């Protein structure tokens, strides 16, 4: 990240802290670690996780509920991706002049398990129709 090796926690935390109005995370493989990365997000920022919550070690409702109780200032919602995403990305401040997009090699739940890349993509306009479609998707219901 920023042309240097960093810990996954530092990278995610530094990206999320830059948000002014919203954070969108598109990642089909979410887990408790995904939520932990978001815990220091700025107060008042709306966070949406887009995921189909697939694979082993899925995020469960009890983990989500406990996280929300422990971090009540984190405004977090979830929507389905609809099974069409392989890549993972983060969108900060969608639809504003400050919009930024980051492409993430590894799933956020596995961040720190090995070397991966997170890069900023400066061609943000190509993501507008993708995010507009995702925002119309139904709410993700987590397993018990």
Functional labels for PLM-detected ranges:
Residues 15-20:
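Secondary-structure "cap/kink" motif recognition
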Residues 1-5, 9, 31-144:
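PLD/PLD-like phosphodiesterase catalytic module centered on the HKD motif
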Residues 23:
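Catalytic histidine site
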């Amino acid at each position: 990240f920023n042309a240097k090796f960093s810990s996954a926690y530092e990278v995610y935390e530094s990206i999320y802290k830059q948000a002014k109005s919203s954070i969108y995370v598109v990642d089909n493989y979410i887990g408790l670690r995904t939520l932990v990365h978001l815990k220091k997000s700025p107060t008042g920022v709306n966070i949406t996780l887009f995921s189909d919550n697939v694979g082993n070690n899925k995020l469960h409702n009890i983990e989500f509920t406990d996280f929300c109780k422990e971090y009540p200032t984190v405004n977090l919602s979830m929507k389905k991706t609809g099974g069409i995403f392989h890549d993972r990305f983060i969108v900060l401040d969608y639809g504003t002049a400050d919009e930024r997009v980051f492409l993430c090699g590894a799933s956020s739940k596995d961040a720190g398990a090995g070397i991966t890349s997170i890069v900023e993509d400066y061609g943000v306009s190509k993501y507008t129709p993708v995010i507009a479609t995702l925002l119309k998707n139904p709410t993700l219901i987590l397993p018990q």
